[in-house]
């Protein structure tokens, strides 16, 4: 996916921490939490092609302390001014919230201090269909259910070619591959016949409709304070 987006391999780093384990890791920072699916518990298995050594390479333990240490090392190595991360108040996915928390802890630990967060939301607390409408359409602001910090917005336009590139990059994500369950596919056929709804040809997963739009939407948070 990164290489499709023009990011060279030498700037891609695999960390290898396990899905849906970040909140538990944050609650017990020194305890290792392995994969729920494969029972694997050594993050080094995916790191053999990384361009630099990281703190967790020493013991391979999937702990919160190792994650924060890895992120701090990456900050000091690449020295980014801007970081892209899930919105911790808007996106309720537990791993997304915890990943931004880990990033904030890493910034506090690191000698390098980025200046800006660009934050996005893949999910909402009360509505997983946002943004509404077809792929290629615009993105409206999410419903204002709870008060949020007063962040600025940035909404860059995407050309048709860039939208296709984004869809192709998404198609390389293993959890977005494959067809829909029969019940969901049947519901789509009914919606298509009765309401004229259409889904993108690039992928059947709902994320292809939600994520590939004619512009992006980021909340911009100043970290300089």
Walk through the language-model features, giving the residues of each.
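Glycine-rich phosphate-binding loop and adjoining beta1-alpha1-beta2 segment
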Residues: 1-14
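Short loop/turn segments at strand-loop or loop-helix junctions that form parts
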Residues: 15-19
């Amino acid at each position: 996916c990164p290489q499709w987006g023009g990011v060279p391999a030498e700037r891609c780093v695999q960390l290898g921490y396990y899905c849906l384990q970040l909140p538990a890791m944050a609650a017990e920072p020194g305890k290792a939490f392995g994969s729920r699916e494969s029972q694997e518990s050594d993050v080094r298995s995916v790191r053999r092609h990384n361009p630099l050594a990281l703190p967790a390479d020493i013991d391979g333990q999937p702990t919160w302390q190792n994650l924060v240490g890895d992120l701090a090392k990456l900050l000091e190595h690449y020295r980014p001014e801007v970081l892209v991360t899930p919105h911790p108040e808007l996106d309720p996915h537990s791993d997304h919230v915890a990943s931004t928390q880990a990033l904030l802890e890493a910034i506090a630990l690191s000698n390098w201090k980025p200046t800006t967060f660009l934050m996005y939301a893949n999910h909402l607390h009360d509505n997983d269909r946002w943004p509404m409408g077809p792929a290629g359409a615009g993105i409206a602001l999410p419903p204002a259910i709870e008060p949020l910090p007063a962040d600025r917005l940035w909404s860059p336009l995407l050309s048709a070619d860039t939208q296709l590139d984004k869809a192709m990059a998404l198609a390389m994500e293993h959890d977005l591959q494959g067809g829909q369950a029969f019940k969901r596919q049947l519901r789509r056929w009914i919606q298509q016949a009765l309401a004229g709804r259409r889904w993108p040809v690039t992928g059947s997963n709902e994320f292809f409709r939600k994520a590939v739009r004619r512009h992006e939407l980021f909340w911009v948070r100043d970290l300089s304070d």
